[in-house]
């Protein structure tokens, strides 16, 4: 009957969802709301949702952009299993091939819509070294340092003995305090577990700080508390100087129809995105959106800049330029916090 058929279909869908949840190790997240998931957890959930349809080909657009290194390695291992065990063809676009490079059967480099290189991973890396393409900086460190272009730690280990290390620079004296957290406790709901518990720290002027941690460890939550967007239920936040936040979902900042209505022309020029001035901000790529959002944050003139994944979606050359820009800001007395 029709009713029995509907029941069977629902059971089949539920069974397939359960299989995908187990394959991607998502069982601990099944009772969570999607809004409470971290960026990396949402990415894994999206991949699992795509696989419920049993596709033969997966097209993934920057799938590792929101993943920490440990989660990225796990994600890539899942993709490798999908390819090797289930025969799924995987085509992945990325600005940072990194660990994925060694697992690929072939790599294609696009420049202005044209294919400038297509080869196996090692030949691809050698071609980048010979051409001096800016994407060279996106290769694993070993492939940049050595002519043998090792793509994995195992390949690079025999060559590491030839390296000589420089001593680390002496630490600079601390400046004035620009942000202080004292015994901060935060939870998204009254009966939920604490995301931040009795956290204390002090930031000083002219420094660049990094916040690292696995997906779901509370990095973005901490930035939200620092910025005053999220209110802790216990503890104290002191912000004696103006503070600006670049959120993980940068599109929340876009309230105008043109980029040049959001960011000053001089800032667009400094960030190398003046050509985007007349574009609609919601039509931009992920990396372009991050740079426009960063421009908006810089235009506030705030002394403390809280940047959540500012390099997500940026290619190697753009990352290097952004790093130089941030170092210049710190030298000018700004405080930068990076997730």
Task: Please describe what each predicted stretch is.
Residues 212-214:
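The feature captures the beta-strand-to-loop junction immediately N-terminal to the Walker
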Residues 50-51, 298:
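ABC ATPase C-loop
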Residues 58-61, 305-308:
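Catalytic Walker B motif of ABC-type/P-loop ATPase nucleotide-binding domains
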Residues 12-29, 264-278, 295:
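Conserved ABC ATPase "signature" region
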Residues 110, 114-145:
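Conserved beta-strand-loop-alpha-helix hinge in the C-terminal portion
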Residues 1-8:
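Short, small-residue-biased leader/transition segments that mark boundaries at the very start
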């Amino acid at each position: 009957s029709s009713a029995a058929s509907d029941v069977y279909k629902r059971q089949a869908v539920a069974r397939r969802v359960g299989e995908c949840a187990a394959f991607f190790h998502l069982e601990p997240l099944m009772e969570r709301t999607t809004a409470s998931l971290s960026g990396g957890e949402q990415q894994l959930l999206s991949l699992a949702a795509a696989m419920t349809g049993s596709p033969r080909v997966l097209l993934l657009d920057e799938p590792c952009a929101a993943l920490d290194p440990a989660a990225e390695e796990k994600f890539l291992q899942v993709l490798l299993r999908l390819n090797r065990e289930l025969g799924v063809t995987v085509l992945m676009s990325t600005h940072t091939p990194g660990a994925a490079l060694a697992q690929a059967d072939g790599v294609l480099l696009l420049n202005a819509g044209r294919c400038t290189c297509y080869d196996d991973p090692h030949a691809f890396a050698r071609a980048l070294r010979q051409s001096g393409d800016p994407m060279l900086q996106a290769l694993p460190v070993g492939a940049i340092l050595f002519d043998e272009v090792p793509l994995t730690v195992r390949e690079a280990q025999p060559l590491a003995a030839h390296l000589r290390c420089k001593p680390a620079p002496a630490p600079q004296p601390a400046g004035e305090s620009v942000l202080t957290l004292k015994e901060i406790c935060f939870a998204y709901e009254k009966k939920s577990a604490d995301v931040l518990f009795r956290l204390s720290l002090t930031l000083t002027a002219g420094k660049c700080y990094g916040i690292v941690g696995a997906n779901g460890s509370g990095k973005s939550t901490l930035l939200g508390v620092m910025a005053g967007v999220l209110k802790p239920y216990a503890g104290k936040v002191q912000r004696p100087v103006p503070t600006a936040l670049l959120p993980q979902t940068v599109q929340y900042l876009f309230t105008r129809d043109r980029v040049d209505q959001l960011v000053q022309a001089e800032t667009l020029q400094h960030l190398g995105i003046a050509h985007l001035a007349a574009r609609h901000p919601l039509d931009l790529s992920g990396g372009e959106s991050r740079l426009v959002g960063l421009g908006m944050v810089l235009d506030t003139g705030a002394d403390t800049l809280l940047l959540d994944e500012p390099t997500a979606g940026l290619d190697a050359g753009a990352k290097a330029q952004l790093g130089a820009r941030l170092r210049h800001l710190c030298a000018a007395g700004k405080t930068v916090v990076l997730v």
